[in-house]
């Protein structure tokens, strides 16, 4: 029992380390503005309680916040472009919440890991496309135990480990879910890109890398088709070096 607990804590530490380093990787590639949406699916114990919560932001400024009870858009940015972007995303997000709720409720997981009904945290990151094919990254975290990522640029999936891969393979075979993830950005791309361009023209506040406790989802590695800068190579190298130290510490 004690050994199993240590192993679980060790695995969780590695996952959080990967999150922190991958955050540094994506921030180091360029200074482009990006849209970030965080979705949380919780135990739907009552129809009167929020089981889905969504927040979308650009440069840490919230442009949309909704849940399954209050399905209307609220914005922290009073600009017309922010409102237009949020309104365009509202219905796709409501639809995706329902799809993800059905998906996670039908997903069989190890109850010793999830401790009850599995909760799902999803992070979508979309950098300004600059005329290129729009590509988004979808990061999935089930109960802080199963992690996998979907890249719309090349329609590829990556899991953090074999256990996560079992669940990931079932999700990737769901055509309806894949289509929703793939076309989430394209259906609002014009408004999103216009808003990101508008944001780029404004002075950008200096942001700090989040602490490990603030991070809720993981991206194991950047997609192989992405171009890699020197900062990217350094971050990837740090990931592998840190993992080597972590495994050596556990032995």
UniProtKB/Swiss-Prot annotation:
Regarding how it is modified after translation, the entry says: Glycosylated.
Q: Where is this region: Disordered?
A: 196-228
Q: What Pfam families does the entry give?
A: MHC_I_2
Bilayer topology term: Lipid-anchor; GPI-anchor
Q: List the disulfide bonds.
A: 37-56, 88-188
Q: Where is the lipid attached (GPI-anchor amidated serine)?
A: 225
Q: Which residues are glycosylated?
A: 38, 70, 83, 141, 154
Report the induction information. Answer: By retinoic acid.
One MF annotation (Gene Ontology) recorded for this entry: natural killer cell lectin-like receptor binding
Note the pro-peptide positions.
226-251
Compartments annotated for it: namely: Cell membrane
Q: Output a single Gene Ontology CC term carried by this record.
A: plasma membrane
According to the record, the signal peptide region is 1-28
- Coarsely, its chief localization is membrane
Q: In what ranges is there compositional bias, type Low complexity?
A: 209-219
List UniProt keywords, sorted A-Z: Cell membrane, Disulfide bond, Glycoprotein, GPI-anchor, Lipoprotein, Membrane, Signal
Q: Which PANTHER family match?
A: MHC CLASS I-RELATED, RETINOIC ACID EARLY TRANSCRIPT 1E
The family annotation for this protein states: Belongs to the NKG2D ligand family.
Give the protein's recorded name.
Answer: Retinoic acid early-inducible protein 1-epsilon
Organism the protein comes from: Mus musculus
């Amino acid at each position: 029992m004690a050994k199993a607990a240590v192993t679980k804590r060790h695995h969780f530490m590695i996952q959080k380390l990967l999150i922190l380093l991958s955050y540094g990787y994506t921030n180091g590639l360029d200074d482009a503005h990006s849209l970030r949406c965080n979705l949380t699916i919780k135990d739907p114990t009552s129809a009167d309680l929020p089981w889905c919560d969504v927040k979308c932001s650009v440069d840490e400024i919230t442009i949309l916040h909704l849940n399954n009870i209050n399905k209307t858009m609220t914005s922290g940015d009073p600009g017309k472009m922010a409102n237009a972007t949020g309104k365009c995303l509202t219905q796709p997000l409501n639809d995706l919440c329902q799809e993800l709720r059905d998906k996670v409720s039908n997903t069989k997981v190890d109850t010793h890991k999830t401790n009850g009904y599995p909760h799902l945290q999803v992070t979508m990151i979309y950098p300004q496309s600059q005329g290129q094919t729009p590509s988004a990254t979808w990061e999935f975290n089930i109960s802080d135990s199963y992690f996998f990522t979907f890249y719309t640029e090349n329609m590829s999936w990556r899991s953090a480990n074999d256990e996560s891969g079992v669940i990931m393979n079932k999700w990737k075979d769901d055509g309806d879910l894949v289509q929703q993830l793939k076309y989430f950005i394209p259906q609002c791309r014009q408004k999103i890109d216009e808003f990101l361009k508008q944001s780029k023209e404004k002075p950008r506040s200096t942001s700090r890398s989040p602490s490990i406790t603030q991070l809720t989802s993981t991206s194991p590695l950047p997609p192989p088709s992405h171009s890699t800068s020197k900062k990217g190579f350094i971050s990837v190298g740090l990931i592998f070096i840190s993992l080597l130290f972590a495994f050596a510490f556990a032995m």
